[in-house]
Structures are given as C-alpha cells and as structure tokens.
Amino acid sequence: MSQVYRSTRSSSEDTKSFEEAVIQGLAEDGGLFLPAVIPRLREETLFEHWAHLSFQDLAMEIMKFYIADWEIPAPELRELIERSYSSFRSEEVTPLRKNVTGDDENLHILELFHGPTYAFKDVALQFVGNLFEYFLERKNRDVSEEERTHLTVVGATSGDTGSAAIYGLRGKQDVSVFILYPHGRISPIQEEQMTTVEDENVHTMAIEGSFDNCQDIVKSIFVDEEFNRKHNIAAVNSINWARILAQITYYFYSYFRATDGQPGRVKFIVPSGNFGDILAGFYAKQMGLPIEKLVIATNENDILDRFLREGVYERSEDVTATHSPAMDILVSSNFERLLWFFAREQLAQGDDQEAGSIVNRWFEQLREERRFDVPEHLLDAIRYHFDSERVDNYNTLASIRHIYEHAQNPERYVIDPHTAVGICAANRQIAHDQNNEIHYISLATAHPAKFADAVNEALSSYDDYNFDDVLPDRLRRLGDLEKRIKYVDNTDVDVIKSIIEEELINMGIYNP
C-alpha cells in the first residue's frame, strides 16, 4: 500500500513520504504529520489471521499499511522490527498480566516496561533509532566523508522519553542527540539513565524551568529554517509519527490476549500527558479493532480531562508538580492530530486542506489567547470514542496501595505512579459499569523502580515491603557511574542553539 503524510495545519495539497515525515518530525508550518489514509480491516482479517500472531509479526502487518514497500522493502522492514525488539526482557515484548485483582473485575495490566530503559517509550524509540540508522546508511552509501548526511536529534523530556531516545540512538553513526530536561523535575534514576551514557554522540542539558519550557525550546528550534538547514534537525519526541506507528501494535496484541483472540468488549485505560500513547489506540480503533472506549487518565495537569468535559482547550498558567511527573504538562502535543481528524470529519466534510485551515486557526488562537473551544457536535463525536478521568496525588498513592494489597496475579504487585493514575481511572470505570463482560486493559507505562519517592511514600508502612526487592540490578548500578550533564539556567532558545552548535563544532561535525 502506498501511503503519504500531510501536516495537521496545512491548507495545501503538499504531502511527504514516510522517510521525510520521520526525519523531519515537525512540519514547516508547525503542524504534525499524519497519514493521509487510515486502512480499515475486515473482522475476518483481525480474528482469523491476526489474533494469534506474535508481537513482531503483528507489527509487520500493521506497519506495511503505513510504509510503502518502495521506501522500506518488506524483508528489510522485518529485520528492523526484529532488531528493535531483540533487547526486550520479555519474549512477548509487551506481556499482558491478566486478572490482576481476580477474575471478577477483568482488570488486566499491559506491561510496557520490559525494554532497555524500563519504560513504554522503548517500544517506539528502539524502532525509531533503527529507522534513523537505516535511512542514513542508505543515504550515505558510496558518498565521501565531506558529503555524508548527519542528523542532529533534539528532544525535550519529562523523564522517560530522554533515556529511551538516548538508548535508541547511542552509538549510531551520523547521529548526534541532544536531550533537554527540567532540572530537579525528573526522578534520580531517570536522570542517571540519561546522563551516565558514555557514547560521544549523546548530550544532555538540565534546564532551569518546566518541561513545557523545554518543549517550547525544541519547537522553536524546529521552525528555525536556517538552523534546520545547517544541522538537519530531527525529532524523537512523541510528535514523530514513527513513534505513534510503533505503539499501535500493542493495542492489537493486548486486545487479542485479553479476549483469547475473539471479538469482545474492551476498554483501554491510558495514563496520558502528551496524548501519543492513547492516540495510537485511536488509530487501532479506526483500523477496525473493536475497542469499546479509550479512557484518558490524567493527573492534576488536566487539560485533556477539562476538554472532554467542557469542549475548551485551555492552557493553564503553570504546571502542577505531581507524583506522576511524565504527565506534568500544560499542552498535550499529540492532541492536535486527533483534532485534525475530527475537524475533517465534523466540520470540513472530509476535506483535508480545510481541516488543516481549521486546526491552524485553533492553534493560532491558543498561542494568542491561551485557549480555544470546539463545536458541541464535534465534542460529542470525540466523546463517542473517549472518556476521561482526573486523578489527584492522594488517589495516585492510594491506587499503588490498593494494588499492593489486593493483587492476586501476582500477590504484592508494585506499580509506578503513572500506572497508578491509570489503575485509579480503571477502577472508577469498573465501579460505574458494573459489567463483568467488559475487559479493562490498563497500561503500565514504567517500572516502579524508576519512581522510588512515590512508591516508597505509598508502601513504606508495609512490613513486607522493601524497595531493594523492586530495584533491578541494572538500575542499581547506575548510581556508581559518572554523569555527563550541561546545566543551563536560561530558557532562551538562542542560548540552547549556541550550545548545540558549539558541541557539533567540538565533535568536528560542523565547520562554520
């Protein structure tokens, strides 16, 4: 299948190839790339042919719809997929822990933390790193050293994206990676994972500010045409379409495991910040996977929950620090892709260009007025697919304790605070629905050892709890390694660009 990509803010007919969309990351107009067509699969394909496939085979079947064979031939795509998941600690890649609290509730936990950095983002970023390497090897084949293409990857992280990006790109030829994170606002283990990597192509910057400050810097860099031209800036944040694509697979995979390969009633509960993870679930639903509802679980930074309730997308004045810091955001970057879809369906009569104009107006209004609202019928259309729950700090810790006390498969199961936000939301859905025919799949987005402070606060009063039992040896050893960090007490984008350029000069990659 041939597939092209367009910008969420474009009113033109211009499109990009998969390679262009992945390497560029963010469109020239500030929009996000998305596929022009979402394939729709027949029920027969899903439940007779796909239901019992391995994770890797499912990924292959899904990605073939979004990556044209002329861009990546099928044998080479399969090799990329196999290599991307070879470092995961589970043969299933994303195993589903079924009926965690007993058979009556049908509460299943999808463990997404079995990759090299113990976070769900490994599922996407191991694949993205190999994609970058594949495209660069092909582009640089048979060219002189002076003519080689070099990518400069720039990303912002609230914790797990940074380490997953670094582990996906470390040591890759012709790639330099610069990760910005808010100083003092990520967990010690997350910082250690990013800053103890010795590969020379990896650079970390601790910024005095919030995650949104870091993200705004990155977005400003991406729309700077001159800086892009000089340094071939590329993205690994959740704005990169390849990340969404890689995450679609585990919605199919876990659905089939929960229902034993049969059609069934399934709700997915997804801890949500930048909306990339749950957006992948929406694409799975649009492809034909019969998901009953996608439940957005937010913490106290609740722009998504407020939108679902009121139809107003409004940026708060400041970020609230919570026990689930990866979700401490003001603006949910990937939500723009969902808005484009519903603008096209509900307001633009299926016209891609008109949908782009509408989304562009909304985000201009957000930039100028910090808010915009949408028509009620568009909001109703979104509510048909989505529900939302807001979970505060108190209930986050209470959910960690609840699972620890009530888990049966296994007993004394420990979850991280982001997963706990999802579990709290799932339990509310279970209590509301009172229907044991529904399967509730709650996404476990990180290993609990990555968030020691919150887990210890929740569980330290239990006599049989010891954090040392939770901490994997690989993470324990990070504390003994030397850190490489550049501290930046300025959120001026020009300062950050100067630092990046200086490092590229020092590495002999850029000669001004």
From Swiss-Prot:
Pathway: Amino-acid biosynthesis; L-threonine biosynthesis; L-threonine from L-aspartate: step 5/5. It comes from the Eukaryota. The modification N6-(pyridoxal phosphate)lysine is found at residue 121. Pfam families: PALP (PF00291), THR4_C (PF24857), Thr_synth_N (PF14821). Its EC number is 4.2.3.1. InterPro entries: Ser/Thr_deHydtase_PyrdxlP-BS (IPR000634), Thr_synth_N (IPR029144), Thr_synth_N_sf (IPR037158), Thr_synthase-like (IPR004450), Threonine_Synthase (IPR051166), TrpB-like_PALP (IPR001926), TrpB-like_PALP_sf (IPR036052). Pyridoxal 5'-phosphate binds at residues 273-275, 277, 445. GO terms for biological process: threonine biosynthetic process. Keywords: Amino-acid biosynthesis, Lyase, Pyridoxal phosphate, Threonine biosynthesis. Its cofactor is pyridoxal 5'-phosphate. It is an enzyme of class 4 (lyase). Catalyzes the gamma-elimination of phosphate from L-phosphohomoserine and the beta-addition of water to produce L-threonine. Belongs to the threonine synthase family. This is Threonine synthase. It comes from Eremothecium gossypii (strain ATCC 10895 / CBS 109.51 / FGSC 9923 / NRRL Y-1056) (Yeast). The gene is THR4.
